[in-house]
Amino acid sequence: TWEAKIGERPDAEVMAERKEHYSASVPDRVAYLTAGIDSQLDRYEMRVWGWGPGEESWLIDRQIIMGRHDDEQTLLRVDEAINKTYTRRNGAEMSVSRICWDTGGIDPTIVYERSKKHGLFRVIPIKGAS
């Protein structure tokens, strides 16, 4: 893991030069997409990551879905986020291959039932760290 040394800061100009611009939401080098959903009492937070050769990764999307964790309308918006597709530069659509959904902090049966709906090999219930 990377550790910042006290007093060490990246040069803003160097960082600006390294910035990459994409014409699509998914960079060309991405081979597949994964996601994680964090469960909270008042929201769900989902992050979608694109993975390329050599474990290179890109944050593709971040969604915060506000609402009670057990409200059907909130869960329908989570379903939409799970089923969202992402576009490559050539116009091809990609969907998320695997999703880990945190069961901690809420009634886990909500996550289990929703995972079954989407397919347990695609949406996998997990116990997140406390």
Task: Annotate each predicted stretch with a short phrase.
Residues 1-34, 47:
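A contiguous, basic/glycine-rich beta-loop/short-helix subdomain that forms a polymer-engagement track
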Residues 105-130:
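Metal-dependent DNA phosphodiester-chemistry modules and their immediately adjacent helices/loops
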Residues 37-39, 97-104, 126-127:
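Short His-Asn-centered micro-motif
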